[in-house]
Regions:
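Conserved two-lobed SF2 helicase motor
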Residues: 145-160
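Ser/Thr-glycine-rich phosphate-binding loops at phosphate-binding pockets of nucleotides
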Residues: 28-32, 96, 154-158, 172
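Short, flexible loop segments at the rims of nucleotide/cofactor-binding pockets, characterized by
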Residues: 2-5, 63-70, 148
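Interdomain hinge/linker at the junction between the two RecA-like core domains of SF2 helicases
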Residues: 33-85
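Post-DEXD/H (motif II) to motif III coupling segment of the RecA-like Helicase ATP-binding lobe
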Residues: 1-54
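C-terminal helicase lobe and adjacent C-terminal extensions/tails of nucleic-acid helicase motors
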Residues: 37, 74-93, 100-144, 167, ...
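Loop/turn-to-beta-strand initiation segments
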Residues: 21-26, 89, 149-152
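Residues immediately C-terminal
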Residues: 1-2, 33, 99, 161, ...
Length: 392
């Protein structure tokens, strides 16, 4: 998806520094925002060459746009209507983990109600590293172009760039154009499949709960800039049928132009951060994370309980000053397999129910948290402390 304004400022400033010291940089991307292109040109001057290869790609997508929220029943009915297809591997991409989990449960219920035996799978970022590794291995196998299947996979933005997969059909919420086109790249990836019928179904309206809505007043919980989301709706609302790579580029250049974004909060935040970097203000803020996303690593108590003997052995190795460095690193990596990275606002030290902390190294503690976790759904709920008869 589109980089946060802070991260974009770091990247462009970093590229500028690399070239200043004689380095060469190649940026390969399927979606280059005009604003980012302009900022690169300003940072690098004449020492830049830009080429667009979108016209070389075959048409891969046929689009059907829905001006409503992404609903499980619509996905299910469409999937059933494709029963005569040799393969109908279906990828559902949601904007939040909560939405993905809901749609997964709903699709499982619909399949059971209709008595249809189909593999329905869930993948998002709130699994332990060990569980996620297994799921990613499975989706990579299913996602091979030559693999024929009727499976349904529900996921989030983690499939946009990190996984090389090729599905037959896509159902997705709109986030913004850049993210959307990355998601579409997971369908008919090599352009070898027919596009006589729609293979990408896009819901323009967000399904997420109010606190995750794009206009939320809490910027830490928002997942898209207001202006960029509104412009993306405007760009996609009249799209229908075969959707060429050139058309995608035209929409980005038209609706995400420098002029349209100039007054947006996104650009204002970018410019402020870039100015801070130019003035080396970063030295005074070296304790702040690069991205405006604060994550905390945790271990679910149920996972800890199942693997307590091995984890305690690893803790002993880590604490023992006589242990070899290689053994300590191996022990840390073993424990990392049971960790989940979650947003900071989900774990509050004075409220969250924790069992203990595991110290991996100085100033790096991993809390063991009481929560609802299993390898099917991933992390669902983090439990709060009980005090007397009250739940805080």
């Amino acid at each position: 998806q589109m980089y946060s304004p802070d991260l974009l400022a770091y990247l462009i400033y970093g590229v500028k520094l690399i070239t200043r010291f004689g380095g060469k940089v190649a940026i390969l991307t399927a979606t280059m925002p005009p604003f980012a292109k302009k900022e690169l040109e300003l940072a690098l001057g004449d020492d830049i060459a830009i080429r667009d290869f979108s016209h070389l790609k075959p048409d891969r997508h046929n689009v059907e746009v829905w001006d409503k929220k992404l609903e499980s029943v619509d996905i299910w009915n469409k999937w059933k209507s494709l029963k005569d297809k040799k393969s109908r591997k279906t990828l559902v991409v949601c904007n939040s983990i909560e939405t993905a989990q809901k749609i997964y449960k709903e699709l499982k219920a619909l399949s059971q109600a209709d008595g249809i035996d189909v593999k329905i799978n869930l993948l998002h970022s709130r699994y332990t590293r060990a569980d996620r590794r297994i799921k990613e291995s499975c989706i990579l196998d299913v996602g091979k172009t030559s693999y024929k299947s009727h499976e349904i996979w529900i996921s989030t933005s983690i499939v946009e760039a990190s996984l090389d997969i090729d599905f037959d059909y896509l159902f997705t919420e709109l986030l913004e154009l850049f993210s959307l086109f990355q998601r579409m790249g997971r369908v008919n990836r090599k352009g070898l499949k027919s596009i006589d019928e729609a293979n990408c179904f896009i819901a323009l309206q967000l399904r997420d709960a109010p606190e995750r809505h794009y206009r939320s007043t809490n910027s830490d919980m928002r997942f898209v800039d207001d202006d960029i989301y509104d412009l993306s709706i405007e760009a996609m609302k009249n799209v229908s049928g075969v959707f060429s790579e050139q058309h995608k580029t035209e929409l980005i250049n038209t609706y995400m132009s420098v002029e349209k974004l100039e007054a947006s909060d996104y650009v204002k935040k970018y410019k402020k951060q870039y100015q801070n970097l130019e003035g080396f203000y970063i030295e005074e803020k070296d304790q702040e994370p690069i991205r405006d996303i604060h994550n905390i690593d945790i271990i679910p108590f149920s996972v800890y309980k199942e693997n307590v003997e091995e984890i305690e052995k690893c803790e002993t190795i880590i604490k023992d000053r006589s242990s070899e460095v290689a053994d300590k690193l191996k022990a840390i990596e073993y424990i990392r397999d049971y960790m989940i990275s979650v947003p900071w606002y989900l774990v509050k030290t004075d409220v969250t129910k924790t069992e203990k902390d595991i110290v991996l190294k100085k100033k790096f503690k991993v809390p063991i948290v009481h929560c609802n976790y299993d390898s099917e759904m991933g992390l669902q709920e983090i439990y709060k402390q009980e005090r007397g008869n009250n739940i805080l």
